[in-house]
Amino acid sequence: MSNTDNIFSAPIDKIGDFTFDARVAEVFPDMIQRSVPGYSNIISAIGMLAERFVKPHSNIYDLGCSLGAATLSMRRHIQQEGCTIFAIDNSEAMVERCKLHVNAYRSDTPVEVIEADIREVEIKDASVVVLNFTLQFLSPDDRYALLEKIHAGLRPGGILILSEKYVFEDESSNELLIDLHHDFKRANGYSELEVSQKRSAIENVMRPDSITVHKQRFEKIGFSSSEVWFQCFNFGSMFAIK
């Protein structure tokens, strides 16, 4: 059972950059459910997409796996033989808790939980790759290289599932969607102080792209098609097919 997220509930004199440390890992399920609109729907549908695209004797990658929600959703849906899921995160605290979550369930599909920098991990013989609210935390210069590596490591017909927070070119629309997201957080019990302090902590480490930028990047890398399959306010998920 997850603890309640109250990390930003008291005034903080000097707000540092947001990190996925032990404190965040402890409350992460509560934090993400109350902060990301449609998160449960995305996790469920990642499993459905995996069921459609996983091929026998292929690899599945969950890059930036946090506590393994997407990994577990995929493992529940995979019916193919000879598949391995590689769940990778660079946070020691997340990896340790992810291992506990994965080991709590039996399955014919093995999962390897690995502490590593996803920019340095080899992607090979993959039918499914997931980046679930991960790419936005990489520096813009690293994003293209990672996506290029994923494309190279995917089998023809393989799928990349990319969930992200978005920015929008139209300034008034962008501001409205930001405001609606903050309303969502308030409706889920976060105070004005928590909303404000979390935004200050995360704005320097999370730099989202527009949907247009994502689609142009996919096309340039060589994916055959891409589309948004889910969106709620300024959060959503896309697929890109090799």
UniProtKB/Swiss-Prot annotation:
It is an enzyme of class 2 (transferase). Its EC number is 2.1.3.-. SUPFAM superfamilies: S-adenosyl-L-methionine-dependent methyltransferases. It catalyses: prephenate + S-adenosyl-L-methionine = carboxy-S-adenosyl-L-methionine + 3-phenylpyruvate + H2O. The keyword Nucleotidyltransferase does not apply. GO terms for biological process: tRNA wobble uridine modification. The keyword Transferase applies. It comes from the Bacteria. One of its GO terms (molecular function) is S-adenosyl-L-methionine binding. Pfam families: Methyltransf_25. Keywords: S-adenosyl-L-methionine, Transferase. S-adenosyl-L-methionine binds at residues 39, 64-66, 89-90, 117-118, 132, 199. Gene3D superfamilies: Vaccinia Virus protein VP39. Catalyzes the conversion of S-adenosyl-L-methionine (SAM) to carboxy-S-adenosyl-L-methionine (Cx-SAM). Belongs to the class I-like SAM-binding methyltransferase superfamily. Cx-SAM synthase family. Homodimer. HAMAP family: Cx_SAM_synthase. This is Carboxy-S-adenosyl-L-methionine synthase. It comes from Vibrio atlanticus (strain LGP32).
